[in-house]
Amino acid sequence: QDGMEILWYFGEPSPYQILQEIYLEIIPAYDRTMIQGGIWKLTLTPKQLVDGRFDFWMPSGAQINEETGFLVSESALTLTIPSTARRPITVAAYDANTDTYAPFSGRGYVCCNRSKPDLAAPGVDILSCAPGGGYTRKSGTSMACPFVTGSAALLMQYGIISGNDSYLYGQKVKAYLIRGARRTRAF
């Protein structure tokens, strides 16, 4: 497109992703302040093809405007960093009233046939403290994570503080949380 510059960054494997990543950034050129709107078509022509598969991800919502998106997107591949990493406990949100996956919650697979998130917790219409006092209802994975964080803290208290298992932390806590989770047909 006229008036646009494309920046390519060839990444290396990282703690978040063992695959080769290529970062593409489209920025306004010259004295423009905005990127031209419309439908963009990207054509990739590799010099050498290893497996022929590629995925595109966009930055999270805070970094783009609400009209930016893929023409045809895949809702089953909506994870963001750091949820793609192997070791962190990744938490999704679900609606406890309907026992359904929250539409705003990321999901998908990462490399090596691993799927994420690891657990789901209530994250829709959660009653919580409001700024300035009182209570309010909020939705989001930020409301689901405290359920899992509190459970992890209780497990660690039982194991480490109470002397029942001095190695009950990290991946062991994650394994116990996953094993103890209630399965549902919804996801």
Give a label for each model feature.
Residues 48-50, 110, 125:
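Residues that cap or initiate secondary-structure elements
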Residues 1, 67-86, 92-115, 127-139, ...:
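Active-site-adjacent substrate-recognition loops and nearby beta-strands
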Residues 116-117, 150:
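Residue-level detector of alpha-helical segments with a strong bias toward transmembrane helices
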Residues 31-35, 47-85, 102:
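Acidic, Ser/Thr/Gly/Pro-rich low-complexity segments that form flexible
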Residues 39-45, 90, 118-120:
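Residues within well-ordered beta-strands of beta-sheet-rich folds
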Residues 123-186:
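Hydrolase catalytic cores
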Residues 1-53:
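Noncatalytic accessory or regulatory domains flanking protease catalytic cores in secreted, cell-surface
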